[in-house]
Structures are given as C-alpha cells and as structure tokens.
Amino acid sequence: MTILQEVARRRTFAIISHPDAGKTTLTEKLLLFAGAIQIAGSVKARKASRHASSDWMEIEKQRGISVASSVMQMEYRDCVINLLDTPGHQDFSEDTYRVLTAVDAALMVIDAANGVEPQTIRLLQVCRARNTPIITFINKMDREVREPLELLSEIESHLGMDAVPFSWPVGMGKSFGGVFDIRRDRMRLFRPGQERRNDDDEFIDGLSNPQIAERFGQAFEQASGEIELINEAAPAFDHAAFLAGKQTPVFFGSAINNFGVQEVLDALVDLAPQPGARQALEREVKPEEPKFTGVVFKVQANMDPAHRDRVAFVRVSSGRFERGMRLKVARTNKEMRPNNVVSFLSQRRELLDEAYAGDVIGIPNHGVLQLGDVLTEGESLRFTGLPFFAPELFQAVEVKDPLRTKQLRVGLTQLGEEGAIQVFRPEVAGGSLLLGAVGQLQFEVVAHRLKTEYGVEARMLPSRYTMARWITSENPKALRKFMDANAAHIAYDVVDAAAFLIGSSAQLRVAEELYPEVKFHAMREHGGKVFGDTL
C-alpha cells in the first residue's frame, strides 16, 4: 500500500468523560468488539484477578480510576484504530489535554443519569478550541436515567453544537427494551449480559411495525413519538458540520452489557476523519508526505517496573516510520536510531516495524526524549500546543530515609518530565523540593508511585505557596534584579525555567507593578521555554 492508502485507513481518537460515566468500560468493550481482547475486565471487580486492560498502573487497579492515559491499537473493518483512553479524574486534566492534541476525533461518554457534568464541559471546550469532531455515547440506559430529549437539549446548550441522534432508546431502567436505529429503521432488542457479542441480537424492522408496539407498549409509544419529533425538528446529519465540530452524532446504550457498542465502533470507522495536516511554526505538515515527522505528546515512566524504563509516546504526523531509521530530535539537534519501537495494547507491547500518520508509537529511552519533542528525518520543525499550566496546589516533599535522597530526586525528575507532577527546585540552597499540582489526587498518586516504583517513602508537607508564574524578560538585568530581590520565592522546574512562587494574587499584582519589565506567565510549552497566558 502507498502512504496515502495507509493514512486513509487510520482513525485516531480519544475517549473523554466525567469520572464514573463508564469510559473505561466502553474502552474495554470497543476492544472486545474489534477482536483485540477475548474477555473484558470488569472495572468494578477490582479485587478479582481481572482488571480493565486500559487501567494498568498499580494505583489504577486499586482505586478503579484511570490516572494515566492508555494507548491501544486495533484493526476493525480494514481500518487501523488508535484508541487513547484518558484520565476521567479532574486532577489529571493536563494529561487529558495533552492526549487531545494527538487525536483527530473524540468519543464523549455521558452517564444518562447525570447528563453533561463539569469535567466533560472543560474537556469539550478543549475539543471545541481545536475543532475536534465529537461522537457522543449516552451510557447506562439500563439504569434509572433522565429523559433522552432532556439530555439532548443539555448537550446542545453546554457544547454549543447540534446533537443528531443516530439511535433512540425504547424505555429506560428496568423497562429498557433496546434502541431504535433511526437511519436503518430497525430496533435492536436489549438483552443483558457482560460477555455477550452482537452475533445473536434480535432485530425488528420498521418504526410502524405492530410487533414492536405489541411487545413494548407504552415505552415504544413514547419513543416513536419522540423519533417522529426528531425527524421533523432536528437538523439532518451533515458530515462536513460534524468534521468542523458543529454537529455531534448521538448513540444510546449500555456499555457494561455490550449494548450499543457495535454502532459506536462502526461510526468511528464511517464518520471519524483520517489523519489531517498539522501546523508547525515553520510550515504545514501533511500526513502523506514521504518523510517522517512525529511529536512526543506523553512520556510514561516505569511502564515495565522490572526495567525502570521510560517510554515516549509519539504521534506520527507524516510519512512512514521504520524501525532503526535515523531520526533527529529537533530540540537538541541530536540523532537517534530507535530499534525496539513498540505499539500498545495498554501495557502489553509488541515490537513494531512500521507506522504511518495517525499511529501512536512508543520509543523506550532513558531521558533522551521529553514532552513536546519533535522527531524528523533531518528538518528542524517546532509544534506548539502542549502546555504545562501553572499549578494551584503546592506541597514540599522530603524523604523519610536520608539515604534514599538520590532515589527521591531520580523519581521526581522522571515523574516531572512525564508530566505526572510539576517539580520545583528552590534557588536558595538547602530548601525542600516543591511539588505543584492542579488537583490533590496528583500528590497521592506521586507518593504511591515513589513508593512502589522507586522504593522511596516520601513525606508530603504543607506549603505556604498557592500560585506559580514562570518569569521572563527581554532585559536580562531587570530579570536578574527581580530574582535577586525575591530569591526566597524563585524556583526552577524540570527544564530549568525560572518560576516565581507566591502565596496570594495580591503579591503577584505588587510584583507586576514594581517590575514592569518582567513578564509573568501562567503557561509553559512542553517543548521548552516558550510561554503564554491562555489556551
């Protein structure tokens, strides 16, 4: 196949949702239906030996939440699907944001009982800012849930886009009878069962078929009235509007019962776009170009604790990747020849010989690659859009056993480069390392990982700081003067970018007034010392 044909087969998407909407379950079931796994690990059965394929880190298995993004590749209907499962917990929104820069579409999972929740809205704003097409799956229809028309209205008002139902529920909760496929004019009957595939599903054709009315009575009467209303009032599906992020196709189902999953998988193949062009600072990079380019959007330490390794997750932007090819790291101008490159089914790795635009490949390395790095066959390119946000919570960290100080620094350096936490080193000698986070759970996860992956018992101590701003100035003397005058508040992050740490916004306002030549930034690009203040 040509590069163009290979690119046309690719679909790369992320699954996003509020915590507990059933995202990890749906991820499992998509893998099951595509034939990538034989048995889905129930996320609820955490104490059993079976765990969700996409929740592989020890703390995820214990707590039943996704805290690191997982990457999985599978083939379905002659398409290569790259599925990125993201953390649902709000404390990990930065990691989710980084994943959303690497995909061409998003699958939004909504809990039918709760509707559109705050975390979903934040993630959707990121998708909207990038014009990422969104497919919506309304989950848990076999529970007591809200009215479907109400849910549609909520999606439209919160997301600012038209919701176009492709299927519609007949009943809900205990009286959930199935979903009616509006486009194919047939009803798929619901039968509970977690290990069931769709091979033996029962269908009844035709909205006006008396058989359906006979079997489902009042529930179908209500559903058919709603479907008629939708056919008259809702806009028709427009593929161009979907690709522009102005329409979202909506599906209903119950992921835990494998119901409605097939339709979503088919929609991903039929509707989601193939990889598109990506804008670098220097030029537009097209996926069908013969030369390889790729961007590191995630670094994960200790995917294999036995080897203490770090894997850089690279989204291929153009060309064809071949194992052993010579690549240039644009940030350092250094050359590398990765030989043991892998593709993923969560933590299960397979050696990879080639990859094309849209694919996500893993390059094991020992700190050579950082978040935001661009890999090319020689060209100097810079991609932006992979930010660190200024943390809002701070804790000092100390090691209980002074003999483990080196391991603490190694662990925090790796976790900081991975983006799991922000690590600040005080300018004043002898000060404790400071950790910065956007949510409290990040500290717990880091303490747990330091213990299990690096053998370090760390103490987290309260900090007087509540705010950080990276500092720059076009006048080096003005910057030095500011740093000398505020030495006790200056610290350096993992790329040695200087930051000003303070306890209140009032302190920031005073500093801005006293030092007009110094700029205070709420955001830093992962690619290095590139700063900004907004998304």
From Swiss-Prot:
Record keywords, A-Z: Cytoplasm, GTP-binding, Nucleotide-binding, Protein biosynthesis
Gene Ontology CC, one term: cytosol
- Asked if the keyword Protein biosynthesis belongs to this entry, the reply reads yes
Q: Sorted alphabetically, which HAMAP family does this protein's record hold? A: Rel_fac_3 (MF_00072)
Annotated protein name in UniProt: Peptide chain release factor 3
Q: What this chain does, per the record?
A: Increases the formation of ribosomal termination complexes and stimulates activities of RF-1 and RF-2. It binds guanine nucleotides and has strong preference for UGA stop codons. It may interact directly with the ribosome. The stimulation of RF-1 and RF-2 is significantly reduced by GTP and GDP, but not by GMP.
Source taxon at top rank: Bacteria
Which species is the source of this protein?
Bordetella avium (strain 197N)
